[in-house]
Regions:
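Extended, low-polarity transmembrane helix blocks
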Residues: 1-37, 55, 66, 73, ...
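Membrane-interface interhelical connector segments
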Residues: 34-60
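Short hydrophobic alpha-helical membrane-embedded segments
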Residues: 60-67
């Protein structure tokens, strides 16, 4: 436990987590903003939100990418860092099981989808159809990094990415 605490005190894991999660959320949020119709269709594939009234699913398709971009900006700038890390942790805690459940629901629907790791699906992240297992691994890694950013006690690299700025 002491080694982890010493590593955290350097601020480097926090900086690493902020950069990786921040740029990932920025990239995927921008992808969704650039094609809201495709994002709406991928949300519909999950069958988690009611189709009626339509303003609910449409609102999520419009607002969620902007939340992701705002969280990315906060993580990268260090402004409201814990709030942004809480949001990204919460979003990943919802997205990851949803991707898993989508993958499970598609097993056996095509001859090539014999197991979860065979499934290729549009996860809704903005990158099109991707293999489910690597996406789950990526999301779990992002979730751990986001949790690190949330729980880190380091006082280094809490502001901007450039020391003394932000």
């Amino acid at each position: 436990m002491g080694a982890i605490r010493n590593l955290d005190a350097t601020g480097l894991p926090l900086l690493f987590a902020r950069i990786i999660v921040g740029f990932t959320f920025l990239y995927y949020g921008a992808q969704k903003i650039s094609d809201p119709i495709a994002f709406l269709k991928s949300i519909e594939a999950y069958n988690m939100l009611p189709a009626e009234p339509s303003w609910i699913i449409n609102g999520v398709a419009v607002i969620l990418p902007w939340i992701e971009v705002l969280c990315a900006g906060a993580l990268l700038s260090g402004i409201q860092l814990r709030a942004a890390a809480l949001w990204t942790t919460g979003l990943l805690a919802v997205f990851t099981p949803a991707i898993y459940l989508l993958g499970v629901s598609l097993v056996g629907t095509k001859p090539e989808f014999q197991s979860l790791c065979d499934v290729i699906a549009d996860c809704g992240c903005g990158s099109g159809a991707v293999p489910v297992c690597p996406k789950l691994a990526t999301n779990c890694g992002l979730l751990l990094l986001s949790l690190w950013a949330l729980l880190s006690r380091s006082t280094r690299f809490r502001g901007g990415l450039i020391p003394g700025v932000g």
